[in-house]
Structures are given as C-alpha cells and as structure tokens.
Amino acid sequence: MELYDQDGKKNRVLLIDVNCKHSSTGKIVYELFDRIRRDGRSAAVCYGRGERIKEQGIYKFGIDWETNVHALLTRITGLNGCFSAFSTRRLIRYIEEYQPDMIHIHELHAYFVNLKPLLRYIKKKRIPVVWTFHCEYMYTGKCGHAYECLGFQKSCGNCPSVHDYPKSLFLDQTKRMLHWKKELLSDMDLHIVTPSKWLANRVQMSFLKDKQISVIHNGIDTSVFHPVDACDLREQLNIPKDYKVVLAIAPDIMSEQKGGKWVLQLAELMKDEKVMFVLVGA
C-alpha cells in the first residue's frame, strides 16, 4: 500500500486493465481494488474487455464491437494500441470525473485502447502513474515476450515475431511503434513495478532504464498454498520415496511462452532415472 501514499496522504487511486475479476491480471486488479478500499482509500477500476461488472466503482469503458475492429485493423496495418477512439474517450471522460491522485496501470494491449491520447492526457494532467508490467509490451515494438531478441534496445524492425500476438498479417510496424512508445513514456512521471527480477532486468535493458523500478512479486492465497509434510505428499501422489521430483508450474504449459517443450526434453533425458515429473496448472 505504500506505493499509493504520498506525503502521508492516502491517495485516490484509479486502476486500469484489460480485464477485471477475470484472467490473471484482472484478478490481481480486483484484489487490489478490494484491498485499497478496505484500507480506507478511495479506489475505482476501469477495464476494457469481458463481462460488464455491476459493482460500484467498477467501469467497463471498452466497446466490444470497437475491440473487434481494432483487432482487425491491427492484422491489416500492423499497428496496435492506436485505434479504439470511442472507448478511449470514454476512459478519459471517466478519469476527468473521478479525478484520481494516482493511476495504477496494468495491461494496455489487447485491442481496447488508444495509447497516444490516453497517455498524453495523463501527462497533461500530471497524474503520477504506477505501472505494473506483466509482460514486455510497453518497451518493445509489439512483443509481449521478446524471447532472445534484443531489438528493443535500439529500434526494433525486422521483427521475428511479427505474425505472433498482437498479430500482423502483412506489415512490420515495430520500429514505428517503439518510436511512439519512447515518445510517450520517456518524459512520463512513472514508477514501474514488475512481478519478477527477470522482468525488472529486462526493463533496465530498455529505454525505460532510468525510471524507478520496483519488484513486487504476485501474492498467493496462503490458505491454499502452504508447506505440507513432504512424506505425506509423496504418499498422496504415489511418488516412491527414492525418486527425485521435478516440479513445473504453468497454465497452458505446452504453449511456446511457457516452455513445456523443455520439460519434455528433460523428461526424455532422464527417462532411465528414478525421477517423477509433477506438473501444476498444465
């Protein structure tokens, strides 16, 4: 909660994300919203996609048909984060009415908002921003995960992932979009938060390296996830006592981003050893 305080004052906080209450970041945003209000602060959530939530202080500004058009235009033009004019106006209007002391941004990709007018408005009003980076999108030309590519350190272009999400069918606009992001973010009053040291290190390799960067790990529900007796767990999972255990945790683990292929390769290398692979969330 310290991030939301300023000169001893409990700030009025607006959280912005693609989702609310659903998906990984949407759940995080809703939990923050609930915690902030229970701590005696004023809080609101603006989100762009998903079902409309009928709770006070939660506003869906995204227009579904416009999101679909945005996704189509991205595929045709190679540009993303620069359409959805009507949805973006609704978001800016809400900010005008709510008058937050601080804005906490999470994800702004996924075809639901126009970055330029939104970020220029926030800078014009001099609203401090805490921005949690859950991926690499805001300092690359387009990539949520750049893998081994370090093109974002210079100017992007010749993108090896141009056909990946956010997908372009024809044009590589990554050099142009990275230039836009540098223009929008370089002079912004911005505190970046990452959920891992790895991502913080990647941010420090980018044009945002001089911004304040903090690592705050994602929280867990300790009533569900907590230490248990290892022997009891082995018995429950039918793992022999003399077997080693390799644990892999990820949703959709066989997707390229989650690295499931490395688990399979490791399993093949260790197939003759006394080892058990345990996959969680796969």
What name fits each language-model region?
Residues 1-57, 96-98, 124-127, 265-271:
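N-terminal subdomain of nucleotide-sugar transferases
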Residues 56-89, 107, 164-173:
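A short, charged, and often flexible helix/loop element on the N-terminal side
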Residues 92-113, 128-134:
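Short N-terminal targeting/anchoring amphipathic segment
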Residues 102-104, 120-164, 191-193:
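Active-site proximal beta-strand in glycosyltransferases
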Residues 124, 152-192, 205-208, 212:
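Membrane-proximal helix-turn-helix segments that form the acceptor-binding/catalytic region
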Residues 178, 226-239:
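A short helix/loop element that forms part of the nucleotide-sugar donor recognition site in Leloir-type
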Residues 198, 219:
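Carbohydrate-associated surface elements
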Residues 239-258, 264-268:
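Conserved donor-binding/catalytic core segment of Leloir-type glycosyltransferases
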